């Protein structure tokens, strides 16, 4: 199948910023990056904004965030994990007329546009409902989802499901083996955020 040129696949972006950040001990979204002028959520919006349009940020009710150049949606079911928030983000993307959305956690500062583009290209080539990276484990929150899965999410949540794995297991999913998993790194401490990582080769 012919390769699709970069940026030809319409793709929305959803940043899940409303997690409880128990291991961090503070809100990850507003954690300043080295240099202190940009927060983690601003950084993630900037990465996704290079490839995705529109971009949505899912936040908890009352969660303080810096002023962002994208819509902020408040989680209607806080405390239930990422599945309901993902569904809300997918629905917003679908209402914006976009068929695919890249969904990620807010704590992935080493995420690359190249990874996002690769997953989007695979989603179009295979027509899979979900395309997610795999490096020994599934990365549900760094994946491309069809936005029409929003209804399926609502059904799963209504049945008591809380895990992203429930959505992937109920969908036509394609797992992409990642030779370099550094872009998928989640930061769970301020020290981890400030620790430099070697660039990929």
Curated annotation (Swiss-Prot):
It is found in: Cytoplasm. HAMAP family: MobA. Keywords: Cytoplasm, GTP-binding, Magnesium, Metal-binding, Molybdenum cofactor biosynthesis, Nucleotide-binding, Transferase. Transmembrane segments: none annotated. Transfers a GMP moiety from GTP to Mo-molybdopterin (Mo-MPT) cofactor (Moco or molybdenum cofactor) to form Mo-molybdopterin guanine dinucleotide (Mo-MGD) cofactor. InterPro entries: MobA-like_NTP_Trfase, Molybde_CF_guanTrfase, Nucleotide-diphossugar_trans. One of its GO terms (cellular component) is cytoplasm. Its EC number is 2.7.7.77. Its main location: cytoplasm. It catalyses: Mo-molybdopterin + GTP + H(+) = Mo-molybdopterin guanine dinucleotide + diphosphate. It comes from Mycobacterium tuberculosis (strain ATCC 25618 / H37Rv). It comes from the Bacteria. The N-terminal domain determines nucleotide recognition and specific binding, while the C-terminal domain determines the specific binding to the target protein. Pfam families: NTP_transf_3. GO terms for biological process: Mo-molybdopterin cofactor biosynthetic process. This is Probable molybdenum cofactor guanylyltransferase. Belongs to the MobA family. GO terms for molecular function: GTP binding; metal ion binding; molybdenum cofactor guanylyltransferase activity; nucleotidyltransferase activity. Its cofactor is Mg(2+). GTP binds at residues 16-18, 28, 75, 107. The keyword Glycoprotein does not apply. Mg(2+) binds at residue 107. NCBIfam families: PRK00576.1 (NF001855).
């Amino acid at each position: 199948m012919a390769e699709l040129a970069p940026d030809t696949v319409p793709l929305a972006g959803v940043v899940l910023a409303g997690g409880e950040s128990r291991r961090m001990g503070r809100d990850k979204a507003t954690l300043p990056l080295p240099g202190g002028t940009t927060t983690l959520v601003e950084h993630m919006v900037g990465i996704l904004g290079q490839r995705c349009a529109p971009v949505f940020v899912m936040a908890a009710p009352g969660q303080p965030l810096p002023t962002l150049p994208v819509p902020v949606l408040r989680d209607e079911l806080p405390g239930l994990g990422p599945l309901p928030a993902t569904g809300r983000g997918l629905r917003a993307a679908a209402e914006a007329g976009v068929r695919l959305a890249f969904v990620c956690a807010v704590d992935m500062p080493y995420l690359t546009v190249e990874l996002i583009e690769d997953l989007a290209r695979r989603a179009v080539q295979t027509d899979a409902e979900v395309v997610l990276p795999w490096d020994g484990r599934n990365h549900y929150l760094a994946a491309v989802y069809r936005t029409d899965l929003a209804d399926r999410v609502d059904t799963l949540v209504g049945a008591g499901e809380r895990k992203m794995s429930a959505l992937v297991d109920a969908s036509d999913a394609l797992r992409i083996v990642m030779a370099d998993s550094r872009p998928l790194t989640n930061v769970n401490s301020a020290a981890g955020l400030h620790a430099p990582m070697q660039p990929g080769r």
